[in-house]
Amino acid sequence: MLILFEPGVCQVDVATGRLKGATNRYVKTFRDLAGLYRDESAYQALIATRGDDVAYEVTDYKPSANGGDIIIGVTRMEPGKIGDEYFMTRGHIHARPNRPEMYYGEAGVGVMLLESPHGEIRTIEMRARTMCYVPPFWIHRSVNVGLEPLVMTFSYPADAGQDYDVIAKAGGMRTVLSMTGTVDGPQSITPVIQGDTHRL
């Protein structure tokens, strides 16, 4: 028997970084990101004043969990640094790793940091109207390298799931994004890929 779902509509509110009409919302505070940054003393200093502040939030619309369906949503990330590392998401690979994902930049300046199963590293600059294709099997995380909130829409198969423990089990991704130079605007921000020198 053919089961049909009703068409749906959501609106991306770039100003708030949320999806109007979302069926789900979750947030990560800075306190939730323990162990993510190299500079533990800088992290603890931030926690002392902003521990319960939202580092990033996700709102999404999930019609179903069926394999042929899709999830759409919006991620909003705060700007800033801990030590010399930019604010970033925990990163993940899909629980069904052969599932892809798409990201579309709405506002801000960011980098999509990707790592293949073979340890290959790719970085994709994310700005407004930039679309990023994350292939199957690639671990990925978002990094806000700008001075304003980074807002992106995304879409992936509804049965993909997320595995957030893979990075922790591996001891971190192979690269981090840090900042050099003086920050006085987006054009002065330079992502520096530091290879195996540092691990998260």
UniProtKB/Swiss-Prot annotation:
It comes from the Bacteria. Homodimer. It holds the Pfam family GPI. InterPro entries: G6P_isomerase_archaea/bacteria, G6P_isomerase_prok, RmlC-like_jellyroll, RmlC_Cupin_sf. It is found in: Cytoplasm. It catalyses: alpha-D-glucose 6-phosphate = beta-D-fructose 6-phosphate. The gene is pgiA2. This is Putative glucose-6-phosphate isomerase 2. Keywords: Cytoplasm, Gluconeogenesis, Glycolysis, Iron, Isomerase, Metal-binding, Plasmid. CDD domains: cupin_PGI. It comes from Rhizobium meliloti (strain 1021) (Ensifer meliloti). R.meliloti has a classic glucose-6-phosphate isomerase (AC Q92SC4) and two archaeal-type glucose-6-phosphate isomerases.
